[in-house]
């Protein structure tokens, strides 16, 4: 596991959040942006950089890195076992963790990078985001191959974590129609491809 954080990373994160803001709002996601950011600045990376530098506190990221590293050491064996168990999943040999204080709670970029928001929850609970986004990376190639709906994808990740970590982490809410994937999951896990092929689709 490797960590990265810098003002440069934060500028990129803020711009990406602004670009996807409409989608995030329509899907009920919470996200954070620098204080004082105006709509007129939304495409000006230099003015965004200035706002970020005013707020940037390296200690916040260092505390988060320490907390995640400690939790990772206690969980990496199980995460590797899950990866090996998931049929045809992407092998996550290494993980690049970019720490941020902006955007949503977490996100991922193939093949092996995740972004974790360190300001949304206490440091000792950040491992839940790391685990969640890591599972996303493992299953994303199959998600794309089978054209799986966003909320079905989220539910599959939640179900994997709930089962393998014995309900240690809270499951995030999904639309009601998605819950029907639970029965398919119980029947076919850990065969992801079968789960995805038999999973529900967005109601028309």
Where in the sequence are the language-model features?
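Auxiliary, metal-adjacent structural segments of Zn-dependent hydrolase domains
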Residues: 52-110, 123, 163-174
